Amino acid sequence: MNIALGVLVLLNSFIAGTEPRDGSHVRTLDKGLRSVIDEGLARSASFRGLVARLDGSDVIVYVEPECPMSSRLFGRLTLLGAGGDRRYVNVRISCMLPVTQQIAALGHELRHAVEIADAPSVIDDASLAAEYRRVGFASRAARSGAGYESRAAIDAAHQVWVELAHTAE
């Protein structure tokens, strides 16, 4: 946990000067992922809804690409910790996916971030595990065996995918 807090302090210092002008709680420094987020916002009402819920919460989401990512995963979320009146998560999305799959994968991970936002008690790995025993289940896709999944996140990815299929690129 001390390492995560150290990373959190570094991230907070680094990101402080690059906070989005619109104040969004979903942030990235990667130009490609900025385009993915923008396209998700433009083409999917569900994606917009997830971002809006996070923007109204105490959770800040930092989105980064991961290359390569395990072939069993499209994305993953890590709880970085809590500080002050904020909680911080890191989302990594596979850069090997086509843009529409990246948007759907990000929608899935943003739903997990909303689940964290909806549970104020989630402030560390132990409380995250307790919350997912309540709202989700263990994921076999995680390399470390400490991964979690929820039906709501699976459904969110599917809904975003459906909405993307019904809008022009």
What residue ranges belong to the model's regions?
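Hydrophobic h-region of N-terminal signal peptides that target proteins for export
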Residues: 2-16
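Structural signature of transmembrane alpha-helix termini at the membrane-water interface
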Residues: 7-11, 114, 164
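Short N-terminal segments immediately surrounding and downstream of signal-peptide cleavage
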Residues: 14-40
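Metalloprotease/metallohydrolase-associated module, dominated by Zn2+-dependent proteases
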Residues: 42-83, 100, 126-169
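Short, charge-rich amphipathic alpha-helices with coiled-coil/heptad character
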Residues: 81-92
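Short pre-active-site segment immediately N-terminal to the catalytic Zn-binding motif
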Residues: 90-106
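Histidine-centered active-site/metal-ligand motif
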Residues: 108, 112, 149-150
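Catalytic Zn2+-binding segment of zinc metalloproteases
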Residues: 110-126
